[in-house]
Amino acid sequence: SVSNIPESIGF
C-alpha cells in the first residue's frame, strides 16, 4: 500500500 507504515510490501 502507499502509506508511511511498513506493510507486507510497502508499495
Curated annotation (Swiss-Prot):
User: What role does it play?
Assistant: Induces contraction of intestinal smooth muscle in isolated guinea pig ileum. Induces proliferation of mouse splenocytes.
Organism for this UniProt entry: Litoria rothii
Q: In which tissues is it expressed?
A: Expressed by the skin dorsal glands.
GO cellular component annotations of the record: extracellular region
Q: Which UniProt keywords apply?
A: Amphibian defense peptide, Secreted
Give the recorded effect for S8A: Abolishes mouse splenocyte proliferation
UniProt effect for mutating S3A: Increases mouse splenocyte proliferation
Q: What S-S linkages are listed for this chain?
A: none
Q: Which GO terms describe its biological process?
A: defense response; positive regulation of leukocyte proliferation; positive regulation of smooth muscle contraction
Q: Which family does it belong to?
A: Belongs to the frog skin active peptide (FSAP) family. Rothein subfamily.
Asked if the Swiss-Prot or TrEMBL record annotates the protein with the keyword Secreted, the reply is yes
**Signal peptide position in this chain?**
none
Recorded superkingdom: Eukaryota
What is its subcellular localisation? Secreted
Consequence of changing E7A: Abolishes mouse splenocyte proliferation
Q: What is this protein called?
A: Rothein 1
